[in-house]
C-alpha cells in the first residue's frame, strides 16, 4: 500500500460511468468468455469509459516530445504494407529464425514468438480468420522507464509503442513479400486482440502480480505488438521460470502502487484464476499522469541482467526442494 493516498481530479472523477471497469473485464465471473473493450477503444463513443479516454488527451505532460512521437506513430500506422507477392514461398524454420535474429540485431524488435491463434483472445464481436499470431516484444530503456510516473517515463512507453507499430509492419511486409497475407496489430489502442494471453502462449514469460508479462531477460519492462497470418511458422511453447511463485511472495509492486490497485492474491476473471489489477483504482492515476508504469519500474525483474540470475536462483531452489522431498519420502 502506498503511503500517500491518491485523490483523483474531480473533473475526471465526474466522468466515470455507472458500470465498473472491473465488471466489463469480467472480474468474479466463473465462466470463460471473450474480453470486452474497456479502454483504449478504437472509437471512444462506443465504450463506457470513452469520456475518460478523451480526458486523458487533455492532460499536458509538459514535454513537447510527446506530440512528436504521436505524429511519428501516426505516420507509421498510415504507411502502406509491402506488396503481397503472387507466389507463396514455404518458409523453412531456419529462414524464420534467421529473419528474427537479423531483425533483433538491427533493432526492429527485441523478441518474437509464434503460437496458434485462440478465438478466445479476440474481443467480443471480432472474428479472426488467420490461424497463427506472431507476438513481438520491445524493451524499454531502463534509465528512462525508471523515471515513471514522471512524464519521461510515459514518453519512453510511447517510444516503444512507436517501435512496436513499426516492427509489426516490418514483419507483416516480410511475410507478404513471401506471398503470405499478414495483418499487423499494435497498441496502445485495443485493436482486435488482447495480446497478453498469446504472449504467454508464445513463450514470452509468465503473468506478474502487476498484470504485465514478466520475461526472464526483459522483466516486465517491454511493450507488445502482433501480426496475424496463416503462414505455418514454427510455434513456441510456454515456459515456467518460477516467476508466478516469486510474485506470490513479493509485495514490491503492490506496496508501490499509489492507488492500491494491485491485489495480494489472484482473482477469478472470465473463468481464469490469475493476477488482476483493479481497473477503477488504476485508471484515474494513469490518466492524470499520461501513463504510470510505477509497478513495472519497481519490479525486481526490471534491472538488466537481474531476471536471468533470478531464474537460475529459483531453478536451484526448486531442485533443492525436490531433493528434500525425495529424501523425506
What are these regions (language model features)?
Residues 1-116, 128-129, 301, 305-329:
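Iron-sulfur (Fe-S) cluster-binding modules
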Residues 101, 110-320:
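Catalytic cores of enzyme domains
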Amino acid at each position: 500500500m502506498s503511503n500517500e493516498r491518491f485523490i483523483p481530479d474531480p473533473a475526471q472523477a465526474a466522468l466515470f460511468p455507472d458500470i465498473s471497469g472491473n465488471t466489463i473485464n469480467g472480474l468474479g465471473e466463473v465462466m470463460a468468455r471473450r474480453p470486452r473493450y474497456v479502454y483504449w477503444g478504437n472509437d471512444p463513443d462506443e465504450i463506457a469509459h470513452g469520456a475518460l479516454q478523451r480526458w486523458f488527451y487533455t492532460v499536458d505532460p509538459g514535454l513537447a516530445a510527446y506530440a512528436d512521437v504521436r505524429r511519428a506513430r501516426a505516420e507509421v500506422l498510415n504507411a502502406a504494407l509491402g506488396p503481397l507477392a503472387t507466389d507463396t514461398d514455404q518458409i523453412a524454420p531456419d529462414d524464420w529464425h534467421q529473419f528474427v535474429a537479423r531483425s533483433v540485431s538491427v533493432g526492429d524488435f527485441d523478441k518474437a514468438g509464434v503460437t496458434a491463434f485462440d478465438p478466445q483472445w479476440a474481443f467480443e464481436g471480432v472474428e479472426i480468420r488467420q490461424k497463427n499470431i506472431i507476438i513481438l516484444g520491445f524493451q524499454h530503456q531502463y534509465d528512462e522507464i525508471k523515471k515513471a510516473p514522471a512524464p519521461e517515463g510515459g514518453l519512453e512507453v510511447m517510444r516503444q509503442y512507436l517501435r512496436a507499430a513499426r516492427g509489426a509492419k516490418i514483419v507483416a511486409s516480410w511475410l507478404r513479400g513471401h506471398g503470405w497475407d499478414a495483418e499487423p496489430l499494435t497498441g496502445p489502442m485495443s485493436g482486435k486482440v488482447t495480446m497478453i494471453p498469446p504472449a504467454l502462449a508464445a513463450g514470452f514469460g509468465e503473468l506478474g502480480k502487476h498484470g504485465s508479462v514478466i520475461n526472464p531477460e526483459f522483466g516486465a519492462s517491454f511493450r507488445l505488438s502482433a501480426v496475424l497470418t496463416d503462414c505455418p511458422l514454427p510455434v513456441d511453447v510456454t515456459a515456467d521460470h518460477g516467476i508466478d511463485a516469486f510474485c506470490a511472495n513479493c509485495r514490491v509492486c503492490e506496496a508501490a502502487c499509489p492507488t492500491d490497485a494491485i491485489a495480494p492474491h489472484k482473482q477469478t476473471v472470465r473463468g481464469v484464476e490469475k493476477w488482476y489489477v483493479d481497473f477503477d483504482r488504476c485508471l484515474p492515476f494513469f490518466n492524470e499522469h499520461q501513463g504510470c508504469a510505477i509497478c513495472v519500474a519497481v519490479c525486481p525483474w526490471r534491472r538488466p541482467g537481474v531476471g536471468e540470475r533470478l531464474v537460475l536462483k529459483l531453478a536451484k531452489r526448486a531442485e533443492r526442494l525436490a531433493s528434500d522431498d525425495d529424501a523425506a519420502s
